[in-house]
Amino acid sequence: MSKRKLTQNQKRRIQSNNEKTLHRHQRREKKEIDWQDDMLGESQDGIVVTRYSVHADVEDAAGEIFRCNLRRTLSSLVVGDRVIWRKGNAQLQGVSGVIEAIKPRQNEIARPDYYDGLKVIAANIDRIIIVSSVLPTLSLNIIDRYLVICENAQIPAVIVVNKVDLLSDQERAEVEAQLRIYQQIGYQTLMISALSGENMEKLTALFDEGTSIFVGQSGVGKSSLINHILPEVNAQVGDISENSGLGQHTTTSSRLYHLRQGGQLIDSPGIREFGLWHLDQEQITRGYREFQYFLGTCKFRDCKHLNDPGCALREAMEQGKIHSVRFANYHRLIASLEETKSQRHFSSEN
């Protein structure tokens, strides 16, 4: 007799319960290695390069990394956070110090979590690099989802399409036409191949300064790109699932890497469903930068931008000022948002 498959909600509930149990256990362990004040040195600046459940790896001004405990007063800590920490006079169970405070963030990138609300992934980002792939097919809808996040966080975005060595001449022309949609509204795009090396120098040049973060679904080749940019890191590369074309998750924790040319790179775990249900319709609408000029000019204040009479957005689309693909993706995103919120409301009542 075959086992009954679990629903996605059941899987998320099981995962959440496991994580909470592990967190409680690690909290108990942490109490055993709390530092006394006279065991700690002077306060110093640092940056979080990796965050674990109750610990974090902090890099000091000299580039040395120390595993630290977190003060219980710290409500949130993520990769990229600039912190005040103190080094211990000795190591205790592999822990070398304590993080005492988080400096104000320049910005943050977050995704919704079904059980814990909004979960911040990284902080103090100068550039978000959206990595997509032509395998199994290039999804503009997924790209638009990431761009909505970027626009709401007010962080510049670069669209990178990987594995273009797999394209025929005709397919390449089609992808180039798709990317022109984004170039025309001011986004930088780049077609690359980690395998053949095409345009990898241009990709590497993006990291000359500032802190960048790779985002993208599993299987798009983020780990392969890191291996090319930082060969000494040797990030684990996952195999593509033969059934879905999506890769297995290969990065378990977000991590910040320093690049030889001076910038930093944050690699985050693959996200198959980058939910946007924490955003309302107005935030989604403002996540489409080419809509900005026309917002507030519709005939009716409560215009849904569908078939409403006097809709400035639809008129702009019909005149070619807004691309029809982006306009269709916008409505697809709004519809999926309403459906997801309805399902969450139903689930919370049962």
UniProtKB/Swiss-Prot annotation:
Binding positions for GTP per the UniProt entry: N162, K163, V164, D165, G216, Q217, S218, G219, V220, G221, K222, S223, S224
One GO process term, biological-process aspect: ribosomal small subunit biogenesis
Domain CP-type G: 106-274
Record-linked Pfam families: RsgA_GTPase
Biased composition, class Basic residues, residue ranges: 1-14
Gene Ontology terms for molecular function: GTP binding; GTPase activity; metal ion binding; rRNA binding
InterPro entries found in the cross-reference section: G_CP_dom (IPR030378), NA-bd_OB-fold (IPR012340), P-loop_NTPase (IPR027417), Ribosome_biogen_GTPase_RsgA (IPR004881), RsgA_GTPase_dom (IPR010914)
Region annotated Disordered, chain positions: 1-32
Keyword Acyltransferase listed: no
EC number per UniProt: 3.6.1.-
GO annotations of cellular component type: cytoplasm
Cofactor(s), names only, from the UniProt record: Zn(2+)
Residues bound to Zn(2+): C298, C303, H305, C311
Subcellular location: Cytoplasm
Keywords, alphabetical: Cytoplasm, GTP-binding, Hydrolase, Metal-binding, Nucleotide-binding, Ribosome biogenesis, RNA-binding, rRNA-binding, Zinc
Keyword Magnesium included in the entry's annotation: no
Similarity remark: Belongs to the TRAFAC class YlqF/YawG GTPase family. RsgA subfamily.
Function as written in the Swiss-Prot or TrEMBL entry: One of several proteins that assist in the late maturation steps of the functional core of the 30S ribosomal subunit. Helps release RbfA from mature subunits. May play a role in the assembly of ribosomal proteins into the subunit. Circularly permuted GTPase that catalyzes slow GTP hydrolysis, GTPase activity is stimulated by the 30S ribosomal subunit.
The protein's name in its UniProt record: Small ribosomal subunit biogenesis GTPase RsgA
Organism: Pasteurella multocida (strain Pm70)
Gene name linked to the record: rsgA
